[in-house]
Swiss-Prot record:
Protein name: Outer-membrane lipoprotein LolB
Gene responsible for this protein: lolB
Source superkingdom: Bacteria
Record family assignment: Belongs to the LolB family.
Gene Ontology terms describing biological process: lipoprotein localization to outer membrane; protein transport
UniProt keyword Transport present: yes
Protein keywords: Cell outer membrane, Chaperone, Lipoprotein, Membrane, Palmitate, Protein transport, Signal, Transport
Lineage: Bacteria, Pseudomonadati, Pseudomonadota, Gammaproteobacteria, Alteromonadales
Residue positions bearing lipid (S-diacylglycerol cysteine): 26
Covalent lipidation (N-palmitoyl cysteine), chain numbering: 26
Gene3D superfamilies: Lipoprotein localisation LolA/LolB/LppX
Bilayer topology annotation: Lipid-anchor
Keyword Lyase attached: no
Role this protein plays: Plays a critical role in the incorporation of lipoproteins in the outer membrane after they are released by the LolA protein.
Residues of the signal peptide: 1-25
């Protein structure tokens, strides 16, 4: 059995046991420690954020749906996939120089999160670019293919690897003072990812008022 089939089978088995056929439910975001919710004028101002949403992955052989929690900062990414009942099926903890993936009771490590996911799952998921796309931003190597009637980016393409990634922003929403995607679709060859952001919160260092102790 190849990596992709083994990986999706183990995750999907966990989800099926919990009775999750599609995404649903609402969970409280895990508490933050050194960062607090802030308001920003645009998503680019948020150097850190956390989101709660849904992720669906489709290939010709498999379909996978799960609840998604992601906490992102310049120093670290923490990503968790859970079932509707709250059962954790995958966790990824990554820094610029290391990555730890826990799935199906097994631990995997690498110096690069994107390389680790591809090695274990067979999926070439663009973890390095997703923080930009999730917030509706365009990377230096992204090409705009279409805009909507309001001039907002509708579709981009990234050709760092072939076949390229095509990213479609399906809908937008106001969150934390900024406008970020509500739903987006990523396609590369026969691999398709759909993300839905139910909650996106910009994070920053808490402000210290005059007279307060840090």
């Amino acid at each position: 059995m190849n990596n992709l089939k083994r990986f999706t089978k183990s995750i999907f088995s966990c989800i099926a046991l919990s009775g999750l056929l599609f995404l649903g439910g609402c969970e409280t975001l895990p508490p933050t420690t050194d960062l607090s919710p802030i308001t920003v004028d645009n998503a680019a101002q948020a150097k850190a954020w956390e989101l709660q949403g849904k992720l669906a992955i489709r290939t010709p052989e498999d379909k996978l749906s799960a609840n998604l929690y992601w906490r992102h900062s310049e120093e670290r990414d923490e990503l968790t996939l859970t079932t509707m009942l709250g059962t954790t099926v995958l966790t990824l903890d990554a820094t610029p120089n290391s990555a730890h993936l826990h799935v199906d009771g097994k631990d995997f490590r690498d110096s690069n999160a994107q390389a680790l996911l591809e090695r274990v799952s067979g999926w070439s998921i663009p973890i390095n670019d997703l923080p930009l796309w999730i917030t509706g931003q365009i990377g230096a190597l992204d090409r705009v293919l279409a805009v909507d009637s309001n001039g907002k980016t509708k579709q981009i393409q990234n050709s760092q690897t072939l076949p390229p990634w095509d990213v479609t922003f399906l809908s937008w929403q106001p969150q934390s003072g900024a406008e970020v995607p509500y739903q987006l679709k990523l396609e590369r060859g026969d691999l398709q990812l759909k993300l839905q952001l139910n909650q996106w919160q910009a994070l920053g260092k808490p402000s210290i008022m005059l007279g307060e102790k840090p």
